[in-house]
C-alpha cells in the first residue's frame, strides 16, 4: 500500500537548521544529512508500522549516520504519515512533540 507523507513545518525548520549546521562543519555534509533524512522517511513510507509506538500514537526512526530521529504519526485510517519532528537525540525527549 502507498502512504502519503505530510511533513510539518517544525520538522522542515529542524532539517533546515541542521543542514546549515552540518554544512558549516564540512561542505556537502548538510546535503548528506538531508539525503539520509529523506532515505529514512522513504523507509517509513514503505514500512510505517516497523517502528515501536511511544506516547500512544507516535513512532520514531533513527536516521543513519546522524544523531537524529524522525518522529511521526501513522494515521492508518487515512493512509497518511505525518512527520512531526526531526529530533536531535541529545535534546530533552519531552521536547519531541512540542510545537
Task: Show which residues each predicted segment covers.
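Arg/Lys-rich, positively charged N-terminal/basic patches that mediate binding to nucleic acids
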Residues: 1-34
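Basic/aromatic recognition patch in beta-strand/loop cores that engages polyanionic ligands
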Residues: 39, 46-77
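Generic recognition of well-ordered alpha-helical segments
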Residues: 13, 17, 39-42, 46
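Enriched for short, Lys/Arg-rich terminal
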Residues: 69, 73-99
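A general structural signal marking secondary-structure boundaries and capping sites
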Residues: 22, 26, 48-51, 90
